[in-house]
């Protein structure tokens, strides 16, 4: 029997189905489990780094860097920016706040000029969201995170896109995976829409945990369960220390 964390790991893996040969940058343990699972199953061409400056030829467990003689390529910081601008990258970040149009906040809570709590700053969010596919992992789906409007825009959402400005043509806020379900921005005016709800989650659960309307909740499918082979990979190969369980509130 699979846990909620393992269902979420599979949902994160599905972010990369049919991605082809692109660089994947998972910024959380859950997203890293998903990326490794995808690479070991249906997306063998995706590229992963060791978190420093090398592309991995193998797919080590979380916290491991693989054999030193199994390096696939060189990816120093400068080349990351080249890849980012080229668009052949999909990043999965966290979000302290996300709104109905996919704006993300990891910078600060409160008014921009007088924030009540400082966080990371915008970091790479602006460059990520304007150049290539960006998804978000949220381990605690609640109204404090899924807000009507973010306090500070770190990563841009669809309501910030100027259709007459070619600089915005690559914006692709792809999906949000939370502990309750999977969501995209296929609703009216690129607003949030339910793609699937995890087993045991009801539309009412999502409504109660979200500060805005999520479209198509009642029509959402059930998130698929991991196969036996996927469960083995998650538990024994990718994440034997069960780090995935620390990121989720079931």
UniProtKB/Swiss-Prot annotation:
Q: What SMART domains does the entry give? A: CoA_trans
Which keywords does this chain's UniProt record carry?
Cholesterol metabolism, Lipid metabolism, Lyase, Steroid metabolism, Sterol metabolism
One GO biological process term is:
cholesterol catabolic process
Task: Give the pathway listed in the UniProt entry for this protein.
Answer: Steroid metabolism; cholesterol degradation
Q: Which reaction does it catalyse?
A: (3E)-2-(2-carboxylatoethyl)-3-methyl-6-oxocyclohex-1-ene-1-carboxyl-CoA + H2O = 6-methyl-3,7-dioxodecanedioyl-CoA
Effect of disrupting the coding gene: IpdAB double deletion mutant does not grow on cholesterol, but grows as the wild-type on glycerol. In the presence of cholesterol, ipdAB double deletion mutant accumulates COCHEA-CoA. Double mutant does not survive in macrophages and displays severely depleted CoASH levels that correlate with a cholesterol-dependent toxicity.
Which molecular function term from Gene Ontology is one that the record holds? CoA-transferase activity
Q: What EC number(s) does its UniProt record assign?
A: 4.1.99.-
Task: State whether keyword Lipid metabolism applies.
Answer: yes
Which family is it part of? Answer: Belongs to the 3-oxoacid CoA-transferase subunit B family.
- What is known about its subunit structure? Heterotetramer composed of 2 IpdA subunits and 2 IpdB subunits.
Report the function annotation for this chain: Involved in the final steps of cholesterol and steroid degradation. Opens the last steroid ring of cholesterol by catalyzing the hydrolysis of (3E)-2-(2-carboxylatoethyl)-3-methyl-6-oxocyclohex-1-ene-1-carboxyl-CoA (COCHEA-CoA) to 6-methyl-3,7-dioxodecanedioyl-CoA (MeDODA-CoA).
**Name of this protein:** Cholesterol ring-cleaving hydrolase IpdB subunit
Which gene carries the instructions for this protein?
Answer: ipdB
């Amino acid at each position: 029997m699979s846990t909620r964390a393992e269902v979420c790991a599979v949902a994160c893996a599905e972010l990369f189905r049919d991605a082809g040969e692109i660089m994947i940058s998972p910024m959380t343990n859950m997203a890293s489990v998903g990326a490794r699972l995808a690479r070991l199953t249906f997306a063998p061409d995706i590229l992963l780094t060791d978190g420093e400056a090398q592309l991995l030829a193998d797919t080590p467990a979380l916290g491991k860097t693989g054999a030193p003689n199994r390096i696939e390529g060189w990816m120093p910081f400068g080349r990351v920016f080249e890849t980012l601008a080229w668009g052949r990258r999909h990043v999965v970040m966290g979000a302290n706040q996300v709104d109905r149009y996919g704006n993300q906040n990891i910078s600060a809570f409160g008014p921009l000029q007088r924030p009540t709590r400082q966080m990371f700053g915008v970091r790479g969010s602006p460059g990520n969201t304007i150049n290539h596919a960006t998804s978000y992992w949220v381990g605690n789906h609640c109204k404090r995170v899924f807000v009507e409007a973010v306090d500070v825009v770190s990563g841009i959402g669809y309501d910030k896109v100027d259709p007459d400005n070619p600089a915005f043509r690559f914006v692709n806020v792809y999906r949000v995976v939370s502990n309750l379900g999977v969501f995209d921005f296929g609703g009216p005016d690129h607003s949030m829409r339910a793609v699937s709800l995890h087993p045991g989650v009801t539309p009412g659960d999502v409504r109660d945990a979200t500060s805005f309307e999520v479209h198509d909740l009642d029509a959402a499918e059930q998130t698929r369960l991991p196969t036996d082979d996927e469960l083995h990979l998650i538990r024994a190969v990718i994440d034997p220390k069960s780090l995935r369980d620390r990121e989720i509130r079931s």
